[in-house]
Regions:
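Short, electropositive alpha-helical surface patch
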Residues: 90-105, 169-180
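Active-site core of metal-dependent hydrolases
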Residues: 141, 145, 149-217
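Divalent metal-dependent hydrolysis catalytic cores, especially in the metallo-beta-lactamase
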Residues: 46-52, 64-93, 109-122, 151-163, ...
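N-terminal small/glycine-rich loop or linker at the start of catalytic domains
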Residues: 36-51, 118-128, 163-172
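Active-site mouth loops of central-metabolism enzymes
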Residues: 47-61, 129-137, 182-184
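Aromatic/hydrophobic pocket-lining residues that form the small-molecule binding cavity
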Residues: 63, 90, 94, 140, ...
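Conserved phosphate-binding/catalytic loop of the ribokinase/pfkB sugar-kinase fold
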Residues: 122-149
Length: 217
């Protein structure tokens, strides 16, 4: 919603806000200096304000400071995202995130969960992106459960490549647990893409980046 800050808001007899002078039309928005909206949600954030969320030595104070800075941009909810790495490294990343989240009320309010982006991705050049392909693996439920345990049960979104072995079997299990599943860093054919959607995939992580330039619609 865009509103004109040069005009006073309307209040009732008790002094409570009744309405704001709203500007209409996209053309007016281009000149807007103030925007009212619900808080924004960032589903994939690897770090902010110089703080790396994939640092196994992440300090709670640094984590909280980065969230305060993020809050000032209008983002009120985010999913700190752990990228592909060795299983031990990913576990350490989640332990550090959990320590930071549990240490601050702001983190608990802003972070409903985490995003696991890898290691069940396509290791081929062009699709793996900046992720280290040597750590990409076929998908197994046991592997995911170990990471979920390290994350305190708070992995709420996972990005996978549906053409990778084990992923199509993993998707419905994740969905059953209430975990949102996205495709990304992938190169599925038409049939595999449809099967992934039927299995429960509902999102695409940074669509157009780390995937084939043309995907079947």
């Amino acid at each position: 919603m865009i509103f004109d800050t040069s005009k006073p808001p309307l209040t009732d007899s008790a002094g409570l806000l009744k309405s704001l002078p709203v500007e209409a039309g996209p053309e007016r928005w281009k000149r807007a200096t103030r925007v009212i909206s619900s808080g924004l949600c960032d589903l994939q954030v690897n770090g902010f304000a110089g703080v790396d969320y994939n640092d196994t030595t992440l300090m709670p104070e640094e984590f909280e400071k980065s969230l305060f800075t993020m809050l000032s941009t209008g983002v009120t909810t985010c999913l700190p995202t752990v990228i592909t790495g060795s299983e031990d490294w990913q576990i350490q990343c989640f332990h550090a995130l959990e320590e930071g989240r549990n240490a601050a009320k702001l983190a608990q309010a802003m972070i409903p969960g985490y995003h696991l982006e890898g290691p069940f991705l396509n290791p081929e050049e062009g699709f793996c992106g900046c992720h280290p392909s040597k750590w990409m693996r076929p998908a197994t439920w046991d592997h995911f459960e170990r990471l979920q345990e390290a994350a305190g049960g708070r992995i709420t979104l996972i990005t996978v490549a549906p053409e990778i072995k084990g992923v199509l079997d993993l998707i419905p299990k994740l969905v059953e647990k209430g975990i949102a599943v996205a495709i990304g860093h992938c190169n599925p054919d038409h049939d595999t893409l449809l099967r992934a959607a039927d299995a429960g995939v509902t999102l695409s992580t940074h669509l157009g980046n780390g995937i084939a330039q043309i995907l079947p619609k």
